[in-house]
């Protein structure tokens, strides 16, 4: 009985649809306004007004042609494709952080290049238009520091020198880092804690977190770079080292440029001045918050 009622309802629905649609499908067209005279609108435009409009259009056309000629004959903006570096010592400076190479001045972090014409060029090592800073490990430059632990400057406090963008992929958040199974080295369990260690057995800390994947290192962001595992240890919970902490007095003669009794930013090569704001933060804990 229930099936019969359902079939009846379906047939009734289909029949209703067919009846309503047949009115439009099979009905003959009806003309409701046949035989009605065309409506005439009084248009009163004299020939004089039309002539004025045509004259104004011609005048505007000539002005546009003149502007186009001026644009074509204008000199092109100079292309600054070869940056001129006036930087003392051996600091590695990233030019073309946005894919735009420009003239580099002595006051690089504070220069205002707005309005300066630049030419877009492809810079080797760029990822998504940003080239991260290349870090100099002073242990490579000075063998006396080869066995010394070295700290990174905190990019959240001091910024990334030489990169003018708000976000540098060298210090991306964890969710923005490409996923990979690469490991710095095998995980080592020590007293129930499991952390990643580098080739020398030192724990790698960056941005206050233990680095557990090779892709979290700044060098991973640089194209064609070797993903080394011997980055210096960086800890946010310990004060920066002093010269006396790293070498004994007999080796002071080899430390050209490193001042005695002063805390160090060991990523700044010897003989290169540390930016004043960073120096104040290192020595006195002063930051511009």
Curated annotation (Swiss-Prot):
Record-given protein name: Minor capsid protein P10
Primary location group: virion
Description of what induces expression: Expressed in the early-late phase of the viral replicative cycle.
Region (Hydrophobic): 1-21
Subunit structure comment from the entry: Interacts with the major capsid protein.
GO CC field: viral capsid
Function: One of the minor capsid proteins that constitute a network internal to the major capsid proteins and outside the lipid membrane. The minor capsid proteins glue and stabilize the capsomers.
Protein's cellular compartments: Virion
Domain topic, free-text comment: The hydrophobic region might anchor the protein in the underlying inner membrane.
Signal sequence coordinates: none
Gene: A454L
Keywords, in A-Z order: Capsid protein, Disulfide bond, Late protein, Virion
């Amino acid at each position: 009985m229930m099936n019969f009622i359902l079939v009846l309802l379906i047939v009734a629905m289909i029949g209703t649809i067919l009846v309503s649609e047949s009115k439009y499908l099979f009905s003959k067209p009806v003309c409701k306004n046949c035989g009605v005279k065309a409506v005439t609108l009084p248009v009163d435009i004299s020939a004089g007004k039309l002539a004025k409009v045509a004259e104004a259009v011609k005048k505007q056309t000539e002005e546009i042609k003149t502007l186009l000629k001026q644009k074509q004959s204008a000199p092109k903006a100079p292309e600054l494709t070869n940056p001129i570096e006036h930087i003392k010592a051996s600091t590695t400076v990233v030019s073309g952080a946005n894919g735009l190479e420009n003239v580099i001045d002595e006051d690089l972090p504070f220069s205002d290049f707005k309005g300066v014409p630049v030419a877009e060029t492809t810079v080797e090592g760029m990822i998504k238009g940003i080239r991260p800073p290349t870090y100099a490990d002073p242990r490579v430059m000075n063998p006396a520091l080869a066995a010394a632990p070295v700290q990174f400057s905190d990019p959240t406090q001091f910024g990334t020198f030489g990169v003018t963008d708000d976000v540098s992929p060298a210090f991306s958040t964890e969710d923005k880092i490409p996923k990979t199974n690469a490991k710095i080295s095998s995980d080592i369990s020590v007293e129930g804690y499991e952390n990643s260690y580098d080739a020398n057995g030192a724990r790698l800390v960056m941005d206050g977190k233990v680095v557990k994947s090779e892709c979290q290192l700044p060098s991973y962001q640089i194209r064609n770079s070797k993903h080394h595992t011997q980055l210096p240890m960086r800890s946010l919970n310990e004060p920066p080292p002093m010269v006396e902490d790293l070498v004994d007095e007999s080796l002071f003669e080899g430390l050209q440029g490193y001042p005695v009794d002063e805390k160090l930013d060991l990523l700044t090569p010897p003989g290169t001045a540390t930016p004043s704001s960073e120096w104040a933060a290192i020595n006195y804990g002063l930051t511009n918050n």
